[in-house]
């Protein structure tokens, strides 16, 4: 069994090379630079600035000996040509070989695939097709062939039913990857308020960390390959009626807000805790706005869940939205590395 101090604490990071130095990365096991994209059939670093950032992140391994640094492909809107390119054996092969070269050139520790999404619609207008599922499997097989056993291969999975059911051939993919990062956030709709990153589902229409984990364990995925997600940002809805403090009401998604900007919200917000979901939320009566987010208490409970369920670890999107002190990463580390 994983001992407590072997849990993964995985930070996605899309920021520049200066911002990262505000954060204490002791106890962070993986830093995933986000994102690289396809250029033709190849994995490519977008520009010189990104290249310098990656070099800086890799240099942090001197300061933090336990840190591994990965790069991620794609992201929301960042995988427009993935379905097309990965539909040919040549495209998959060239991607795998180019990935191996980038990892070697930059002294990186691995690749995280964040294709949103194989088989099912993601960004409007981006291609998806049934063949994506088998093509993804073959892509992983080829990556496994090109990379060394020291290299990490992971992928990000949607935490909602259609992705879990349709996008991935779990039986074939999971033996070849180190773990799956479940994106257990953005789980509620654009047109109704709710918890976007709850630990537990509270009604039959809500997804959660736990619902994704249950799904994967029930189809035989080992817990030692499951990483759950926390959100370092909140989601705000507007036009929310003053019923039940705004929870589960018809409304309109307005915007996201970083955890480190929550203090800028105006004074009209009252905050509440949903004991069933283990999730905080806020409601502003004057403005008819509803906020769903993760706070130190909720991420600490997610970290406790990782320990109690003996999962591989916890990841979050994204580090640059955290407060450098008394933030969410600190709360996660306090729980993961406490000797309880």
Predicted feature locations:
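Substrate-binding surface in catalytic domains of secreted glycosidases
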Residues: 39-52, 97, 118-264
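Conserved, mostly hydrophobic/aromatic
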Residues: 31, 71, 113, 180, ...
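Short, acidic/polar
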Residues: 13-27, 87-105, 161-172, 213, ...
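Short acidic, glycine/proline-enriched helix-loop-strand junctions
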Residues: 122-136, 149-151, 274-276, 323-340
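Folded extracytoplasmic luminal domains of secretory or organellar precursors
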Residues: 91, 103-109, 117, 124, ...
